[in-house]
């Protein structure tokens, strides 16, 4: 099989699948991306770059659409180059939303287009209107509706689509559900496994908590409201008041990965440190950690807090469960799909810092009582999210698409409508 992966980041969700396919000499794997860093053995990485930035005067509803078109054009030019070199894929697997697969059928009309569908934006009922203190105005609702334009184009054009969780699939229009399969990326329980009595010592950042008996952990890409960072910090203030020997370790970057920045340029970390009464000697910000140190953090955790709006479920929660953490998670739909309250984790009101602190205190007061919960958390991952079990299912999903195509294709099937030859050569920006 010849396969072309398309994702502006590298290797992102396609890391393990691309690695597995490339190990088999029967497959030729090419990865189109904007990220020049990193490599995967036997994967040919090819770079594309949009011809320009989004125009500053573009209507703000359409900026995401314009960005997707520019990225789609860049991939079109890359695909034409690959075609001229003799590479014609059987399957193109593109991450939807960014735009890389937008025009790929015009270059490779016979290729199967598979799309990874992570999220479909809704003004009501999921992330956007979740916070009652931050209501949406009419302008925001209209912008959210238009933001789905590139995703809708992919839903129409693709042969098959994949969503990592059932919750995420349910965000997409029901008329496209027949195209969508639920299959998670997978977590590696052979790497994320528990180790009793692990001490948290990270010399690179001068962190030594080998003396600490109570360590509360939190891991995130960005410190932001989407992942409950303000509520988490308010809970930390309460925990510190009640537990003078408890340390809190926060892995992640001081930025916003999802949602809005503060209007004055201040970060949420800065805001919470300024407004809350905290003992900073017992709060440790590690920044983004390499995987070995991140695993060490999870192994040393007495209680791990994971909060999210009704949005994309983070790998970090599943990695924490695989490592045997007691996870105190927000009682929101993506978390409830995995955690059963009181069995393999604990659920708590996203907006209630006092309840979060109370749940943490219970775990810290009686750690032995939660040993069975730690084991059930790991069992959940091993049974349902084990990378080694899921990867063959991903390969089978790709292959099934090819088998279905071979049964339905006709030698006289007309080519889909594409660009004129003039536009093919020019692709004006």
Where are these regions (language model features)?
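Conserved donor-binding/catalytic core segment of Leloir-type glycosyltransferases
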Residues: 203-227, 233-240, 249
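Aromatic "clamp/platform" in nucleotide-sugar-dependent glycosyltransferases that forms part
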Residues: 309
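Short hydrophobic beta-strand element within catalytic cores of glycosyltransferases
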Residues: 326-329
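Carbohydrate-associated surface elements
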Residues: 167, 186
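Nucleotide-activated donor-binding/catalytic signature segment of Leloir-type glycosyltransferases, i.e.
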Residues: 252-256, 261-288, 292
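N-terminal subdomain of nucleotide-sugar transferases
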Residues: 1-46, 388, 419, 423-429
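Acceptor-binding helix/loop patch of EC 2.4 sugar-transfer enzymes
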Residues: 52-62, 110-150, 190-195, 199, ...
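Conserved acidic donor-binding segment of nucleotide-sugar-dependent glycosyltransferases
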Residues: 341-342, 346-353, 362-367
